[in-house]
Design a protein with these regions (language model features):
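Fe(II)/2-oxoglutarate oxygenase catalytic core
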Residues: 2-150
Length: 150
């Protein structure tokens, strides 16, 4: 019996380690993911709520690290929910694990220095990021995936 229990504990530890090791997927690009009406809806909803973006979950503003504006859209809005549901088809997490939809506006000269979407001692780490570009034409800007050398 002892040997059986030890085997179960070992199996549990192996499964836990496998589950917690980061698994990096190749970035994917989906052209025309949003309709023009959906883009307009997001822009209109966010327009009045845009605030200077913070750098940490403590609402600290440091424009040497990040210069942009952010608004958070209610994920229960029917159009926002539909967009998020379409994003979730490509992920292995349920809707209840999602944050509100974050809208970020970068004006000319805006930036966000290299960072990870993670916070020290925070239980709510982001496991996935789905980036939706609302404008086709822009200059500069890039998203880098250092663990994938991309």
């Amino acid at each position: 019996m002892y040997e059986y229990n030890r085997m179960l504990v070992l199996l549990f530890i192996i499964i836990l380690v496998i589950y917690t090791l980061p698994r990096y997927r190749r970035p994917q690009v989906f052209e025309n993911f949003l309709t023009n009406d959906e883009c307009d809806h997001i822009i209109q909803k966010a327009k009045n709520d845009l605030r200077t973006s913070s750098v940490t979950n403590e609402k600290e503003v440091d424009e040497t690290i990040r210069k942009s504006d952010t608004a958070w859209l209610n994920k229960e809005d029917p159009i926002v929910r539909n967009i998020m549901d379409r994003c979730l088809v490509h992920m292995d997490r349920p809707f209840v694990n999602c944050e509100q939809l974050q809208v970020v506006r970068y004006e000319p000269g805006g930036f966000y220095k290299p960072h990870q979407d993670a916070f020290e001692n925070d239980k709510n780490m982001r496991m996935y990021t789905f980036i939706l570009a609302l404008s086709d034409e822009y200059e500069g800007g890039e998203t880098i995936f250092p663990n994938l050398n991309k």
